[in-house]
Amino acid sequence: MTILPERSVTLTRSRNAIERYFSRQNIQIKNDNFGNTLSATVTLLNRESGTKPISGCGKGYAEEASVGALYEAYEHYRSFPALREKSRLYPFGSVIQQAELRGMLPLTILAKSSPAKIAAVEFTDKKGCASLLWPLFLTDCEYFSHIIQGDTTDYSAARRYTSNAGIAAGYGFTEAAIHAIGEIIERHCTGILLAKTFFYGTQKEVRLVNTDSLPPAAEKLFNDAQSALEDEINIIDASEPSLPPVYLAYCKSKPRLGINIYGAGCSLYADHAVARAIKELVQLHKLADNFTCFTEELEKHQHNLREHEKLYRSLVADFGSLASVSVELPEKRAELTLQEHLHRLTTLCEMAGLPVWLKEIDSDPAGVSLACAVMPGMERFALVSLGNVVIPCRSYQDQI
């Protein structure tokens, strides 16, 4: 059986591993699939009675979506508790004075109240040498309901900058780490694009991928997605210099409550990045078609941002209103081993002035692993798509 890009084993072996994990944890699994060819699969984990089910959602063709949903459910089950288990309290001053975090927008907001202690997790760089104390709240979206005793920081003014980007599950740490870093780069580039086009208005056009340049497998996926969504799909090249390719996919005429829904994907392999974006686009529309909570969340986002013109424009993300220039998809690069792939990702980030730190936060003898990647220089403005009242972490007003 074929092993998918950025994966270490077949889907069958990957499924067996995660199902063994859930079985040993006495967790019951319920799967629901939405879609015929390309689809969204929702997995619900049911634990002991009286606890709320935990969900995960997968994308792609049926088997891929099903396995992806299981791993995302594992991520949602263990990620935040695992991070908290690895956290400690540190003097606030020593954390924010680290060179890598100096001037970071959410932390400068917190500093105004002069807290004494803050919860942080220690990460190491790609060489396993230099360490970074990473404030827990920046990644743990549920921390505000589980604040560690002794943490004296008032997070109320900065919690809107919290993002769980950078946590990923996989078969083995290397696979999980690749996906964790990819997610951070994806959010970073998406945030920059939204800031330049809709917040500051310094970028007047987007780069649209000429879909005739897609290789056969990506072209088939593209056509399947257009059939599944009954609409024409556009693909935007959102890549930033020196970083791996990032693409956004959106429907030309399928907004939800006036908000354009888009999928995003990042990979060293441009065709795989496009595939991830297209699959996520289908996933989101299938969820919108089948779950009223999706529309309810969009209504909340609108309510939060309607009075903030630039933020509301960034939420709506009307890419079709912008001019465009056609670009070709780059030729596929040579296949790398997973270890080479991970090394290349971290090296590119470092070369771009955006170093990443990694940590395995959970693992199991079955072979499953949870990785957390953090990038202090990540642009967090993509959080506007969740209805958060945020501003770009840096100014793009002078960039054309």
Region locations from a protein language model:
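Helix-biased "structured C-terminal domain" signature
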Residues: 1-400
